[in-house]
């Protein structure tokens, strides 16, 4: 009896060592909260669902390894834009806006957009990493490495159908403090596209000064 079995090493970073179904949970969470953002009549509750939507998207991005973009979602959208919307909506007469709003007509459009988005997004991601073994010889040979291991090894206890699958990746909580993405983006912005960064800064400065000038009341002569 041959005790040597093929072990497939999948060079994969999309799940950061997590079970891939966690990505499905965050996808469903983001989809449902996005629907409630549209269907909720109370604007404040709608903004709270929007914060949950951005939180789910940020968690999804952190899990798949896009830590800089995921943290940017938390800082920019949740920390600034959503809270600003929440403060603005607190100054609005909510009862009047609730009487004038009718969001039931948006349900078919919401479902249609969700289906179209899912059809475009899901083919881009590995829905099931284990299913890749059925056709890795043809399409994913560069991502797989075959290693012969001995079945009597005490460290190998999770065999399924004589094949052991495991993924190598970076643990996501360690990637949160990893500055590779930030270093790469900063290097590009401050070296290659430095002139565009300066132009964008001047545009932002002009917008701030212009808004202050417009709001200042001119003194009556």
From Swiss-Prot:
Its EC number is 7.1.1.2. GO terms for molecular function: NADH dehydrogenase (ubiquinone) activity. The keyword NAD applies. Keywords: Electron transport, Membrane, Mitochondrion, NAD, Respiratory chain, Translocase, Transmembrane, Transmembrane helix, Transport, Ubiquinone. It is an enzyme of class 7 (translocase). The chain crosses the membrane at residues 18-38, 44-64, 74-94, 107-127, 195-215. Pfam families: Oxidored_q3. One of its GO terms (cellular component) is mitochondrial membrane. It is found in: Mitochondrion membrane. It catalyses: a ubiquinone + NADH + 5 H(+)(in) = a ubiquinol + NAD(+) + 4 H(+)(out). PANTHER family: NADH-UBIQUINONE OXIDOREDUCTASE CHAIN 6 (PTHR33269:SF17). Belongs to the complex I subunit 6 family. This is NADH-ubiquinone oxidoreductase chain 6. It comes from Podospora anserina (strain S / ATCC MYA-4624 / DSM 980 / FGSC 10383). The gene is ND6.
């Amino acid at each position: 009896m041959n005790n040597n079995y093929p072990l497939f090493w999948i060079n994969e970073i999309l799940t950061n060592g997590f079970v891939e179904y966690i990505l499905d949970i965050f996808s469903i969470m983001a989809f449902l909260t996005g629907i409630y953002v549209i269907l909720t009549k109370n604007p404040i509750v709608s903004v709270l669902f929007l914060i949950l939507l951005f939180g789910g998207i940020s968690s999804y991005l952190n899990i798949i390894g896009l830590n800089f973009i995921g943290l940017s979602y938390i800082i920019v959208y949740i920390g600034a834009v959503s809270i600003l919307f929440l403060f603005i909506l607190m100054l609005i007469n909510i009862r009047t806006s609730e009487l004038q709003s009718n969001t039931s007509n948006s349900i078919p459009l919401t479902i249609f957009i969700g289906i179209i988005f899912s059809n475009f997004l899901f083919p881009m991601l590995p829905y099931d990493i284990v299913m890749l073994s059925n056709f890795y010889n043809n399409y994913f040979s560069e991502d797989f490495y075959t290693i012969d291991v001995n079945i009597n090894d005490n460290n190998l206890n999770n065999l399924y159908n004589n094949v052991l699958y495991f993924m190598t990746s970076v643990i996501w909580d360690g990637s949160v403090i990893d500055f590779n993405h930030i270093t790469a983006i900063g290097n590009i912005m401050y070296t290659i596209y430095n002139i565009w960064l300066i132009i964008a800064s001047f545009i932002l400065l002009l917008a701030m000064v212009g808004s202050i000038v417009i709001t200042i009341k001119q003194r009556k002569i």
